[in-house]
Amino acid sequence: MTAKRIIQTIRQNDPAIRSNREAWLYPGLWAMIFHRWANKLYRSGCFFLARLISQWARRRTGIEIHPGAEIGHGLFIDHGAGVVIGETCIIGDNVLIYHGVTLGGTGKDEGKRHPTVESGVVIGAGATILGDIKIGTNAKIGADALVLTDIPAYSTIVGEPARNTRLEASLRSEIAALKVRVEALEKSLNQLNSISPKNMSS
């Protein structure tokens, strides 16, 4: 992702910015520029130099992105302080990450051990997402949420442990519909019970 594209992303996501020059003051811009270089080196096998760049970028920006992480277009890291993105993370396009977010592993497993974040996801400040799990397209992860399992697309997740508020709303509506049906059945049963045997035989 070019610096021009990163600046466009910042301007699209942050109403506080007033000019393209101001975008160069954003730590998220520099974190992405350095990651682009580090990722190229990492993929070419220059692991030490790639890590050197990523660690230098962490000191300069407060954002730690492992050079092995695969990041799509349009990632916006707002504020940025304390963001950690692990080695095997895969991040889609147009993802928004706020400060204090961790996309980490759950142990010493090898191979794919970090989250996959699909396009359009928003991750609130302080959220922790751990393990080889998938965050579905356009899902929203609330601030300080702890996520340890796959999250369906278009879900809204809050709390620790994380709860799917969209799913809860769906369950509430289903329960309400069942309640109406039960009340209708009870009314029908009461009507049947009120009919005397004499009336039934006639």
Feature locations, PLM:
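Terminal amphipathic alpha-helical/low-complexity segments used for targeting or macromolecular assembly
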Residues: 1-61, 171-202
